[in-house]
Amino acid sequence: MSERRSKFFGLVVFLVLIIGFSYLMITGSKASLKEVYNQIEVTENTLLPAKEYLRYAGLSDSTKYENLTLLEVKTKIEKHPYLRKAEVEFDGVNKILVEVQEKEIKAALLQKNELKLLTGDLETLPLFPPTVIEELPVISNLNSREKNFHSKENILFAFRIIDAISLSDTSVRKNLAEINIRRGGDAILTFSGFKFPVLFGKGDEVRKALVLKDLWQQLSNNENPFEKTDYLDLRYKNKVFIGKSKTDLANR
C-alpha cells in the first residue's frame, strides 16, 4: 500500500515538474519574442526635421518607448497637419521605422499679417518652424472686393500661374517670390531676378508664362532691354507692354 502511495506521489511530483517546465518554456518564449524599442527613425521628410515630427507626436523621450505599439506610433505621427500618412514597421532589432508622406505644399499664404501654408488640395496649414519656405511663392492680398466672392477662385488663379510658370521654366519658378492677387483682380508678380513687378492677367496663363520665359532668358544672357523699366504688363492677349520710367522717357 505504501509502495503504491510513493509511486503515486512520485508521479504527481513528476507531472508538476513537467507542467512547471512547460509553463516556463512558454512564458520564456513569449518574453523573448517581445519587441523592444529604443529608437524611432523618421524618413522621407522634407518640410520638417525628423525630431520635430517626433516632438509634435510626443515621442521625443526614448525612455517611454517600452510599452508602445506600432499602431500607437502610427496614430501619433499621423496627427501632424503636414502629413498624409505614415508607414510604420519594426526593424527586428530595436528600432521603429517610420516612413512619412507629406502633403504637397503649393504656396505660402499671407493673411492678416500671418503666414500660413497652402496645399494643392486648398487646405490651409499652420506654419511650424523651422519649415523651409524659401522657394515657395507667397500669395497675398487674397480677399475679394465682393463680399460673396469666394477666395477659392483667387487661390485657383494663383495656382494656375504657379503651374504655368513651373511648366515653362523651373528657374523662373524658383525665383517667383510673390503673387499679389489684388483682391480678385489681375495679379502682380514679384521675382527675385526682376527689379520690377509683372502684371499678370487672368486667362491664357500658359502662353503668358512662355512670354515671361523668353524675357527671363534675355535677362539671363545679359541682354537687358528692361534696365529702366517700371513694370511688365502681360494682361493682354498677344501683347506685352513695357512701362518705362519717366526719367527715361524724358531723356529721349
What role is predicted for each listed range?
Residues 9-27:
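Hydrophobic membrane-insertion alpha-helices, especially the h-region
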Residues 27-131:
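Terminal hydrophobic membrane-targeting helix
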Residues 37, 48, 91-95, 112-113, ...:
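Extracytoplasmic
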Residues 44-81, 133-160, 200-206, 210, ...:
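Periplasmic/extracytosolic POTRA-like scaffold domains at the N-termini of outer-membrane
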Residues 44-46, 100-104, 140-143, 181, ...:
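Flexible glycine-/small-residue-rich
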Residues 63-64, 84-85, 95, 104-108, ...:
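Short beta-strands and strand-coil junctions in structured, solvent-facing domains, enriched
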Residues 99-178:
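Extracytoplasmic segments of membrane-associated envelope/inner-membrane machinery
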Residues 203-252:
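Extracytoplasmic/luminal low-complexity segments enriched in Pro/Gly and acidic/polar residues
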